[in-house]
Amino acid sequence: RRGAGGPGGRGRGRQGRRHTDRKDALKRFEKQGFPSKKDESWKYTSLKSIIQKNYNLSSKSDKSVELRDVKKYFLNDLDSFKIVFVDGIYSPFLSKTTHDGMDICVLSAALSKEKYKSTLKKYFNQIVPKDESLASLNTSYTKEGAYIYIPKGVCPEDPVQIMHISTGNQESIWLQPRNLIIADKNSKVEIIERHQSLKDHSVVTNSLTEIYAEKNAFVDYYKIQNDLNSATLIDNTFISQQRDSNVSVHTFSFGGKLTRNNLNFYQKGENIQSTLKGITILESNQHVDHNTLVNHEQ
């Protein structure tokens, strides 16, 4: 009989905790439901027309995209790491990841490996509020996303591009990407995340990103939201900052039928810099709602 401390026991332990997290999150969402205009922080945005439809929660299409189809959406004039998802599924062909002195890969790989156990226990799902129903929905159903860990004192020259591509090969799809980004002490990282639909089709992306900036860490995060006008994006970002850290989030909202940005900073020390910048350019039938929170815990 293999004990709980053996390799199989450790694997089952990780999967067991993840299963429990999913079940608990789903129970919270079922109790809370979707937010509505009755909620103070959602009084300007209604999801009623969106949630009345039926959606597929996973991609059934085996069709991928060619580099020529998406090349123009990358920042190609600079060297960079790339983590690319097509209809919520990781595309290794379009990606460039690394484990050389840092970890830039997919979250599912990190969750499945023993060497990331202590890091994930410390950070994963630790600053996501229990009363955010759409965050709970993401925790319950997410399958994939980006995992970025920059160790102490490491400052990579190349930025990281995270690309979420919706092809339109499958009508009415609901995507739940999840990103975990950790900048350890005295490290620095630049990240560009883009949401891009290729066809006019009904797609809802309920994205969640956790960012942890340890002491004296620097994070520059650029969000490019340029879906076509039939897409909905709900972007939930939770940022934990330790003393002397500096995190800047630059949000560019250009496309999509409905975009909702929930940006939350949690300052856990002194001499912290939290920068929020953005540009929103809309047409008459588009709706963008930015909701921000800066919580000074000390």
Outline where the language-model segments fall.
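Charged, low-complexity, helix-prone segments enriched in Lys/Glu/Asp/Gln
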Residues: R1-G3, D21-L26, R260
